[in-house]
A protein has these predicted regions:
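Nucleotidyltransferase catalytic core that binds NTPs
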Residues: 1-90
Length: 90
């Protein structure tokens, strides 16, 4: 059976309780959820990429099938394909 991998992209500046709720719900539907902290150059960031990643990791540490990554600057669909994700969470 194919592993169901989903990516949850966003600027997450900051990562909120609403984002966490979405991740929790997704973690019940998919084998793996990748929270992809992306850079939005049209927005002025409150937190650095490293700070955002640390906040996401701390918030999701107790959810076994969730991992956080700093996504490279490219189209979301290209990133999803590169990690084998067939689903994008919005």
């Amino acid at each position: 059976m194919t592993k169901k991998i989903a990516v949850f992209p966003g600027s997450f500046d900051p990562f909120t309780n609403g984002h966490l709720d979405t991740v929790l719900r997704a973690s019940r539907l998919f084998d793996e959820v990748v929270v992809a902290a992306m850079t939005n150059t049209s927005k002025r960031a409150l937190f650095s990429s490293a700070e955002k990643l640390a906040l996401i990791e701390a918030s999701t540490a107790d959810i076994a099938n969730v991992k956080a990554v700093a996504a490279p600057r490219r189209l979301t669909v290209e990133f999803a394909r590169s990690i084998g994700a067939r689903f994008i969470i919005r």
